[in-house]
């Protein structure tokens, strides 16, 4: 009923029946394949309104990632293989997420010696309503990336605002220092010599060179 293709291996039809609604493939990913294809071998036997939900897990097969589904209208699918590192990192963050960390009855049902780097592909027969209630792991990762980008954008905007406010404060203090300096040269006629501006600028350059701009802090 099901067939699995993991490049460059040949087609695998040795699906193991766990229960009337649970099936499982397993393979050793020696070539570090990035994706696999799963398809129905007999579409007519697949009941309309039901789907084959596809899950993937690494040892110890307690963190099942939902990857997508196939049915009579969609008899095949190409799924990306999530990295084991990514699975382990997400495990602690998703313990309470039923869409992301699912035990579908595949655990401990394969009576064989489990080599290292083994991957299990679990297949669970589920209704349309069950399928609609859970997004695939790839879609969840995209949503997480979008949320992270939004957070980064928000942080950048806040930092830019802070820098703008700091610049305004420095500009105000600089102008205030200039005005006070010039007014110190004012005469009884309320005039100031133009040379006072040049003197202020020369003093400012000296302070800037010697890092003596405490009045701007």
UniProtKB/Swiss-Prot annotation:
It comes from the Eukaryota. InterPro entries: Hikeshi-like_C, Hikeshi-like_N, OPI10. Pfam families: Hikeshi-like_C, Hikeshi-like_N. GO terms for cellular component: cytosol; nucleus. GO terms for molecular function: nuclear import signal receptor activity. GO terms for biological process: protein import into nucleus. Belongs to the OPI10 family. This is Protein OPI10 homolog.
């Amino acid at each position: 009923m099901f067939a699995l293709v993991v490049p460059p291996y040949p087609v695998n039809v040795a699906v193991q029946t766990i229960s009337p609604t649970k099936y499982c493939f397993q393979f050793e990913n020696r070539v570090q394949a990035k994706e696999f294809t799963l398809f129905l071998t007999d579409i007519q036997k697949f009941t309309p309104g039901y789907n084959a939900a596809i899950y993937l897990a690494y040892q110890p097969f307690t963190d099942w990632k939902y990857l997508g589904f196939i049915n009579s209208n969609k008899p095949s699918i190409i799924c990306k293989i999530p990295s084991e590192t990514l699975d382990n990192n997400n495990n602690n963050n998703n313990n309470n997420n039923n869409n992301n960390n699912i035990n579908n009855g595949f655990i401990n049902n394969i009576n064989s010696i489990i080599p290292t780097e083994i991957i299990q592909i679990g297949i669970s027969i589920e209704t349309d309503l069950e399928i609609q209630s859970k997004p695939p792991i790839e879609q969840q990762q995209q949503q997480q990336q979008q949320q992270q980008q939004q957070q980064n954008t928000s942080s950048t905007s806040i930092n830019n605002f802070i820098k703008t406010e700091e610049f305004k404060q420095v500009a105000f203090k600089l102008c205030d220092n200039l005005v006070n300096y010039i007014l110190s040269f004012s005469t009884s006629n309320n005039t100031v010599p133009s040379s006072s501006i040049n003197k202020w600028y020369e003093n400012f350059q000296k302070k800037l060179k010697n890092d003596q701009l405490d009045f701007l802090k």
